[in-house]
Every structure is written in C-alpha cells, then in structure tokens.
Curated annotation (Swiss-Prot):
Coiled-coil annotated residue ranges, if any: none
Species this chain originates from: Fusobacterium nucleatum subsp. nucleatum (strain ATCC 25586 / DSM 15643 / BCRC 10681 / CIP 101130 / JCM 8532 / KCTC 2640 / LMG 13131 / VPI 4355)
Stretches assigned to the KH-like domain: 354-438
Name of the protein this chain belongs to: GTPase Der
Residues in EngA-type G domain copies: 3-168, 177-353
Residues reported in the UniProt entry to bind GTP 2: 183-190, 230-234, 295-298
Keyword set includes Zinc-finger: no
Family: Belongs to the TRAFAC class TrmE-Era-EngA-EngB-Septin-like GTPase superfamily. EngA (Der) GTPase family.
Highest classification ranks of the organism: Bacteria, Fusobacteriati, Fusobacteriota, Fusobacteriia, Fusobacteriales
PROSITE patterns according to UniProt: G_ENGA (PS51712)
GO MF: GTP binding; ribosome binding
Length: 440
C-alpha cells in the first residue's frame, strides 16, 4: 500500500493549485475508461524514488459560517485518520486566520506528521514576516512555498520522503485473498462482514487496520483464508449534500489499492447512485476484479427472476466499464447467498491471474481477424501480426501490427470480446494494447 499524503486547509488557500503542480502532467487521464468520471481527487506520484498517493481535499465552498466550520472540522478529522502525512496549507499573503488555528488544533490532537505549507510565498526575503506568523501554530515542519510558481515544492517533497522513509508499512500476507468491501454509507458493508465472520465460519483474528475505524477481519471458509477489508464507520451524509462525497471516496481508495478482489455493495432498495458510480469507477481505474452486490434483496417486494434480469441490464447500462463484473443479489442481514461471494471471489481471482499460451492466443486472434479485419483508415491497410500476454493481475495483451496508432477503440473492444468468449476472464478487467511489430 502506497503512503497517502493529504492536502488540507481552509478554502482559497491554494490547495488545488498545489495538488495540480505536484502531480504534473499526470493530471490528464490518458487511458480513460468510458463512463468513468474524470474529476478524480487523487493521483499516484513519485519523488526521489518514493511512490505515494497525493489526495486533494478541495471543493469545499462555504455557504455560511456554520456550514464552513463543520466541513473544515470534518475535513481535518478525515485527513488525520486516513493520511500517513498531512500537508496543511495556509495563505501566507492573507496571514493567520482563525480557521487555520481551528484546523491546527484538530491536527495536533493526533500523532500524525504534519508539514505546514505557508503558500503564496514567491520571495521569502520580501515576505519572511508573513511566514513567521505561522510558527506559533506549533508544527515541527514549516516550509514557505508557492504552489502556483512551484517555489520550494522540492524541499517540501524531500521532507515528505524523509518522513515516509522512517515509517513501517507492514507487508501483506500473499497467502490470503484480500477482499475490499466498498460502497457508500448504509449499503450494508459491515453487516456483510459480520455475517461472513459469523458462527458458520471461524474468525482467526481481528487486526486493527491502518485507520481508526477500519477493521481487517481474517476468516476461514472451506479451508481457504480471506482477509476482509471493511471501510466501516464511513460518515453518514452531511445535512448539506456534497457532490464529491470525498470521505467515502478516500476510504474506498485505500481499501481498493490493498485488495485482490473488490466487492461493491449497492442498496437494492435505493438503486444505483452517483456515489456508487464514483466508487465503482475507482475500482475500475485501479484495474481490480470486482463483484457487484445488490444487498437488502430481502426487502425488495414483488420480485422474481425477471426482476433480477431487469436490474442486471440496468446496472450494466449505467456501469458499462464493469460489463465483465458478476452481479449477485444477497441479504447481508439474513445471510442469503452471502457465502457465494467468497466462492465467486476465488473464481474471478483465478481469472485475474490466468495466463494464456501464445499459441492458443494467436489461434483465437487469427480467427477473430479473419471474421472481422481491422477497417482501412486513411488509405492504409492494417495488418495484425501476432499477440502475446505480457502480464497477469490484470491480464495484459500486446498485439503487434503495422499501424497501431490507427486502431480504433471499437476494434480493440471487438478483440477484447473475442478473447473473453474464448478464455473467460469473468470478473476480471483485461488490458489490450497495440504496438509496432518488431523489425525481425
């Protein structure tokens, strides 16, 4: 699991500008998935050989003072619990603000490394008096920066790397299948975990997670071990709805990155929501195998097999980027079909780590091309020579051809469908890329 670095601070201190300059050109999503929201709040980045995740807590706009104070407190609390290092951004031009002091008070209550970033300091010698005001907040690390003009960002990142280099990040047990139970508040995640770790299965141990309110539960079922990562304790929606739902997204991200398989919990009574789509999009972008679970199926009235079919069609239409994911209808409360999820997780993880021989792969590719040649583009005839699988988890295939830049995404999707028809890969994302054929 990569360390998480959270940027916090009151509105208009330059958090998002700092975020954008820290991640650089990675802000542009090159290989975007159809239907996945583009406005992500986080990026993987690297500095001096260390990899970590930068999280922006921007997007909090005040409506009134009570609302603003409540949201800032909530933001700082979440950053404390979720992040490994906190970048606390203040505005050096406007000076120390009572809201800065409120955030500082909250951040000091927990033993998390905080780097105080005094922003909008383009010239330290001319603005040093502006910086000195902030030493009274009492943090060990203080760096004057300019997020907009990239002043001192390297020094700030050096401190980040030094801090995380001294941290102990435990190795995950490779023998245990790690299942992330993700979803919005009240979808039944904790109920599912409790049911799976009930009397019929043996709880081996409870391990406190890296956050205050996440619990990893190690269970055994049919001689197999599973580590269930539950994002328990996600805050209920605030009185004022927030479109970005930052808090659920950050916790889901941490769980997804650790997981071998993701279980996306949906509320069958409520149906698919924008927050569900956002969390599903993260799992898809992280290229994890996923099971879509319609929970609270026992509460749906007047249902039959046709109801299931209709809901599946609607879900796949709303989540086209998860067309490969199996959909299960369960009741975490009664236990209906819950153990099916463990067996499905085993099955789709096998698909996720499956390797296809080059000979068999090219037999299927040849048949697919004979059935449907790549369309001629710009007067050029595209010839696909051969394919090979270059990796697993997720399965990645490279197809060599003469004009890879002319391959349309619809033809790549056609090849993916043919590979799925032949080899399965149920529940698993697969990656297909086209490259120039080698000179020999």
């Amino acid at each position: 699991m990569k360390p998480i670095i959270a940027i916090v601070g009151r509105p208009n201190v330059g958090k998002s500008t700092l975020f954008n300059n820290l991640v650089g050109d990675k802000i542009a999503i090159v290989d975007d998935l159809p239907g996945v929201t583009r406005d992500r709040l986080y990026r993987d980045t690297e500095w001096s050989g260390s990899e970590f995740v930068i999280v922006d807590t921007g997007g909090l706009e005040p409506r009134n003072n009570d609302f603003l104070m409540a949201k800032i407190k909530e933001q700082a609390e979440v950053a404390m619990n979720e992040a490994d290092v906190i970048l606390f951004v203040v505005d050096g031009k406007s000076g120390l603000n009572p809201l800065d002091e409120e955030i500082a008070y909250i951040l000091r209550k927990k033993n998390k490394p905080v780097i105080l970033c005094v922003n909008k300091i383009d010239n330290f010698f001319e603005q040093q008096d502006d910086v000195y005001d902030f030493y009274g907040l009492g943090f060990e690390y203080l760096v004057p920066i300019s997020g907009e003009h990239k002043v001192n960002l390297g020094d700030m990142l050096d401190i980040v790397v030094d801090i995380i280099g001294k941290m102990d990040f435990p190795e995950e047990d490779e023998e245990v299948l790690k299942l992330a139970v993700i979803g919005k508040p009240n979808a039944g995640k904790s109920s599912l975990v409790n049911k799976l770790s009930g009397e019929e299965r043996t709880i081996v141990s409870d391990i406190a997670g890296t956050t205050r309110d996440a619990i990893d539960t190690l269970i055994e079922y049919k001689d197999n071990k599973y580590m269930i990562i539950d994002t328990a304790g996600i805050r209920r929606k605030s009185k004022v709805e927030e479109s970005l739902e930052y808090y659920s997204v950050l916790r889901a991200l941490k769980a997804i990155k650790r997981a071998d398989v993701c279980i996306l919990m949906l509320d069958a009574k409520e149906g698919l929501t924008e927050q569900d789509k956002r969390i599903a999009g993260i799992a898809a972008e992280e290229l994890k195998p996923i099971i879509i679970v319609m929970n609270k199926w026992d509460l749906v009235e007047n249902k039959n097999n046709a109801t299931m079919k209709k809901i599946k069609e609607e879900l796949y239409a709303e989540l086209p980027f998860l067309s490969y994911a199996p959909i299960e209808f369960v009741s975490a409360l009664t236990g209906q079909r819950t153990t099916n999820l463990l067996e499905i997780a085993d099955r789709i993880y096998e698909e996720y780590t499956k390797r296809i021989s080059t000979g068999l792969l090219n037999t299927i590719l040849k048949d697919a091309v004979l059935m449907n040649n790549p369309p001629t583009r710009k007067g050029r005839v595209i010839k696909i020579n051969y394919a090979t699988q270059v990796s697993v988890a997720p399965p990645k295939f490279v197809l060599f051809c003469n004009y890879p830049e002319l391959i349309h995404f619809s033809y790549a999707r056609y090849i993916e469908n043919k590979f799925r028809e032949a080899f399965g890969f149920d529940g698993s994302p697969i990656m297909i890329s086209f490259e120039n054929k080698s000179s020999d």
